[in-house]
Amino acid sequence: MSESRRTLLDCAIIFFVTCLLIAPLFRADILIQWDSIESTFIADARLLRDHLPHPAWQPLWYCGTRFDYIYPPALRYGTALISLLAGISTARAYHMYTGVLYALGIAGVYWLAYAGSRSRAQAWLAAIFTALLSPTLLLIPIFRLDSTDWGPQRLHVLMRYGEGPHISALSILGFALAASYLALRKWRPAVLVLSGVLCAAVVANNFYGATALAMFFSILIWAVWLEVRQPVVWLRALGIAALAYGLCAFWLTPSYMRITSLNLHWVAEPSKPSSVAIAICCAAVFCAATFAAAKRQAVTAWPVFLVGASAFTSIFVLGRYYFGLAILGDATRLTPELDLAWILLAAWGLVTAWKRRWLRPLVAVLLCAACYPVVPYLAHRRLPFRRAHDIPDRPEFQVTRWLAGNLPGARAMPSGSIRFWYNAWYDDAQSDGGSSQGMLNQMLPIAHWQITKGERADLAIGWLEALGVDAVIVPGKTSKEVYHEYSYPEKFQGTLLEIYNDHMGNIIYRVPRRFPAIARVVEHGALVAAETPRDGADRERLMRYVSAVENGPDSPVKVKWTGFDDIDVEAAISPGQALLVQETFDPAWQAKADGKRLAIQHDAFGFMLIAAPPGAHTIHLHFETPLENRIGWFITGITCLVAAILLARAKKLRDALYC
């Protein structure tokens, strides 16, 4: 059997054995982890499945935001299409998508280890360790307490915390690095294209996976260059990066990066300049030390890469845990990547040590010791896949069903796990959402904090009215809702009208808005004079804005969504008045009345204020595909053409991958 076929056979065996190990995942629908963020990915995929092919605007989350801003496209489209084509729920489709990639990811570790070492023993050890072990549990006690079955962290965070996009990206990462290693060492056009495609797939699944890719890819370039000492290595690396970006350009726009960076402080601790400086110094020391070693004697790329990958993931994760380093995002979420780096290094070290007879007893002892945590994991291997059987009794389902049936089209404010699951079954609008990094309106976190944490009902009601919210969902202390975000859930009692009470701790209150629609005819001068509140407790500015919105002209407005990207508004406007639409402003929104384009500006709360002419009009608003996305599609098309030309000129891909 040829080497390439043997490698493919090994990968196939690893994939199918891993599938057997996680078999319940492929049959799973909704699991018992009601606090898991996988709910938001399930909800997002359901929305996409029901509104294919590609809505440009997402009106149901965050008082409206760009659909592309919510999350990278791979998992959401993969889940939606599996659900649509297989005729299954998006929850089960999500678990199938993540399960298949998880199993492929273990095979990807094999291919990465084999590509780097040309040792099947190393590759098998790395794959087995990845499927069964988590070295980080030895050094991080809180993770050990959180993972009582001692299972691998990549599976634990997938099932316990819903890190589906992250682990899917990590699963592809092994293949991407293996292809990159081969493409950097020798001119192989087909492998270079494959590397670019796989790197793009990592980024298109998750940004923590992309962070790991950026780190590992940089170390890999350096390691390969130290071995071959050819400047062309850097050109090949640039080609891979260009291909990867080009394939992502249609969604990875400049504004996407800006919004994601802007919102990072809502979901992670900001980077510390001192921590970044430490990381840069460590990188400089690593480069200097390895360069000096390479000048004295020839070095091999693979061990240099392993040492670098292990060192820098340790600086990120262990540095965050033990020394409080904040380099980029929440570094502790890179624990599965740290496991990967350490496992690859351990497999290399054990195989290298085995070649020395006097070290073989030590290797045997270490392998036996590694079996210890495997026993509890295998004994409880089905524990992470427990299905929920109480869905009809859960507030996450009951509340959303009631609102869909009794207040269709209304914007509500859920919280906690109800917020996570709010759109898993119905197209109900909420002022919050499930992916804060995609939030366009920066007033929302201030408002939601005051509503849930503040003691004063009048301030909370003012914020609800300002956001165009018709109903607020308040889980009390006895609710089955998981997070209980309200510090004073009783503050609305006797102040707001109670319209739903399940007598199990979940109450829905009606917000006293003048008209139910998200649009208002307002006095232009009064609304323009309203200022943005300085903070959540700035009652003066808040109520001045609310007064301009709710106490304006007695002119009801009819609002009809004709799709996620289109709104028809019927309004009668008098001189000196304007139309307020409580949907987040974006320059890509266009308004027309009687065939004429109308100017749109944002108000103090980030909503759309339209300069409508006097008279009765039907004003049509349409969210156009932004110019940067159209340019991105052009770049992606050119990239695909270049990739096709490279593939056409390449030899057989199968032979190139293993030479």
Give the residues covered by each predicted segment.
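Start-transfer (signal-anchor) and selected internal transmembrane alpha helices
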Residues: 1-25, 124, 365, 638-659
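Active-site-proximal, structured, solvent-exposed surfaces of multi-pass membrane proteins
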Residues: 3, 540-658
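Membrane-interface helix-loop-helix junctions at transmembrane boundaries of multi-pass membrane enzymes
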Residues: 3-5, 187, 227-239, 287-314, ...
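Active-site lumenal/periplasmic loops and adjacent helix-entry segments of GT-C-fold
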Residues: 7, 20-180, 201-211, 382-391, ...
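Extracytoplasmic
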Residues: 47-52, 85, 107, 167, ...
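Short hydrophobic alpha-helices at membrane interfaces in multi-pass membrane enzymes
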Residues: 179-200, 230-239, 361
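Perimembrane helix-loop-helix junctions
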Residues: 212-242
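Signature aromatic-anchored transmembrane alpha helix within multi-pass, membrane-resident enzymes
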Residues: 242-245, 350-376, 659
